[in-house]
Amino acid sequence: MAAAKKGAKPKVAGVRFAAGFPEEGAHNHVHFDEQLHDSVVMVSQQEDGNFLVKVGFLKILHKYEISFSLPPVQRLGKSICAVPLPTLNLKVLSITSQAEGHSIKCEYTAHKEGVLKEEMILASETNDKAFVKVVVQARVLDRHHGTPMLLEGVRCTGTELEYDSEQSDWHGFD
């Protein structure tokens, strides 16, 4: 009997709309309740002690200044610095010690679409062996999908020029 139902398709019922549904053609906007989601950059500590920073939706070929706070990390102490890494897309601008942790400000370039992860390493200035990895995760939209609402702590600082071969001055070989 189970084999006979294996290829059967489920029945689909009709769709009903609420009584107050607006007429077709009415101009509608999507509104989100403020309590449905947080509108700030999310910082979470992973099981291994490293951090994941979710900065939300960004637009491709745009530069952003991202500010967030890390909770205190005992092994790092108060004085920390960014370890230079060979990445063009994430640059630490400043690290400020606070009463409860550190405030980090960085510059992020959204260079391709999709879910992107860039990492920085923060090290103790007093203990050579103490460091923590911070992964910045962004969901980057292509240029045809509108302008995303930026989270608190994320600020667009400019756009990157997109290379288009049709705009080139080069006309090829004669």
Curated annotation (Swiss-Prot):
<protein>
    <recommendedName>
        <fullName>Adipose-secreted signaling protein</fullName>
    </recommendedName>
</protein>
<comment type="similarity">
    <text>Belongs to the ADISSP family.</text>
</comment>
<dbReference type="InterPro" id="IPR026794">
    <property type="entry name" value="ADISSP"/>
</dbReference>
<keyword id="KW-0964">Secreted</keyword>
<dbReference type="Pfam" id="PF15006">
    <property type="entry name" value="DUF4517"/>
</dbReference>
<dbReference type="GO" id="GO:0005615">
    <property type="term" value="C:extracellular space"/>
</dbReference>
<comment type="function">
    <text>May be involved in thermogenesis and glucose homeostasis.</text>
</comment>
